[in-house]
Regions:
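Glycine/tyrosine- and acidic-biased, solvent-exposed loop/turn segments at the edges of beta-strands
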Residues: 1-222
Length: 222
């Protein structure tokens, strides 16, 4: 490696540039032989970081340019994306929110290039907790999430006016729920893997019972 810059007590201190044998390069501030202050690091693979350093680690605010075209702007703690930031994907997707140890964690908004948007809780890069998802076509889901899927209690509203409120397991209606169409007709019953399953009551918009019976995996039994 090769260093060009200022020294203090035989240690790199002040401004200087260090070039490693693999081609990576740091240009910026040093303190007591380590990167500390403002600086730019160019990685051998083409990635680049511009921002704050402390104790030889990215720490504070910075911008990281990935050679893939992705970009991160935001907070760093001890070398990891931690705190508030924005991650721009080369694909056009974008995440604005909280990070922990390089992953989307806490509260954040993810916008897909398609126009779909999720706003809510994240854990370990996955939609987890409470959140709202809006499809680009206008459908929306608000409720509980686990492992990137609807899991728990939620409300699903479709553009045709159909509204479902109830339980979900792995992205599908499951357990007890109420489904209402745009005319106010209401189905109250149970679901399994997204299909009507079990005893139900159907009422019109005035609450008058239209039908009672039992479904078995989406098929009316009686």
């Amino acid at each position: 490696s090769k260093y060009v810059g200022s020294w203090k007590n035989d240690k790199k201190d002040g401004k200087g540039t260090l070039t490693w044998n693999d081609g990576s390069k740091y240009d910026g501030e040093w303190k007591n032989d380590v990167r500390d202050g403002k600086g730019t690091f160019e990685y051998a693979n083409g990635d680049k970081y511009v921002g704050d350093w402390k104790d030889d680690m990215q720490h504070g605010k910075g911008i990281y340019f990935f050679h893939t075209g992705d970009r991160y702007e935001g907070s760093y703690v001890q070398g990891e994306r931690t705190g508030e930031g924005i991650y721009y994907h080369a694909s056009g997707n974008k995440y604005v929110g909280s990070f922990k140890d390089g992953k989307q964690e806490g509260h954040g908004t993810f916008t897909w290039a398609s126009g779909a948007v999720y706003e809510g809780n994240w854990k370990d890069n996955q939609r987890d907790g409470y959140g709202t998802y809006k499809w680009n076509v206008g459908d929306s889901y608000e409720g509980e999430w686990k492992d990137n899927k609807f899991n728990g209690q939620g409300t699903l509203i479709q553009t045709d006016g159909t509204k479902y409120k109830g339980g979900f397991v792995n992205g599908m209606e499951e357990g007890s729920g109420i489904q209402e169409d745009k005319n106010g007709n209401r189905y109250e019953g149970f679901f399994k893997q997204g299909k009507k399953h079990g005893p139900f009551v159907e009422t019109d918009k005035n609450g008058k019972v239209i039908r009672k019976g039992t479904y078995k995996m989406g098929r009316l039994e009686n």
